[in-house]
């Protein structure tokens, strides 16, 4: 199916793709995304590798939530989910560019 030169070229392309994907993954690990809830009263900053870097809770919310711990917990959870979803979307867009046009499952070989 492939000649020696063709197979060698294909392997070289695969290695280059793998290197490029590793660079993209490293960049994503440093890319910060912000999720929020309660119209910005709770903000969470995380990387596309799901490392939470910062949680910001409005002082107004802290005073308001003094009597409603459950509301504060719900807002933190919602902001965390928002950040996670944005991180996943960003990572999928970035990594999807490498596997576009490949048969399903083949892109997993390069991860």
Swiss-Prot record:
GO terms for molecular function: DNA binding. Keywords: Cytoplasm, DNA-binding. SUPFAM superfamilies: YbaB-like. One of its GO terms (cellular component) is bacterial nucleoid. Gene3D superfamilies: Nucleoid-associated protein YbaB-like domain. It holds the Pfam family YbaB_DNA_bd. InterPro entries: YbaB-like_sf (IPR036894), YbaB/EbfC (IPR004401). It comes from the Bacteria. It is found in: Cytoplasm, Nucleoid. HAMAP family: DNA_YbaB_EbfC. Belongs to the YbaB/EbfC family. PANTHER family: NUCLEOID-ASSOCIATED PROTEIN YBAB. Binds to DNA and alters its conformation. May be involved in regulation of gene expression, nucleoid organization and DNA protection. Homodimer. This is Nucleoid-associated protein NMA1657.
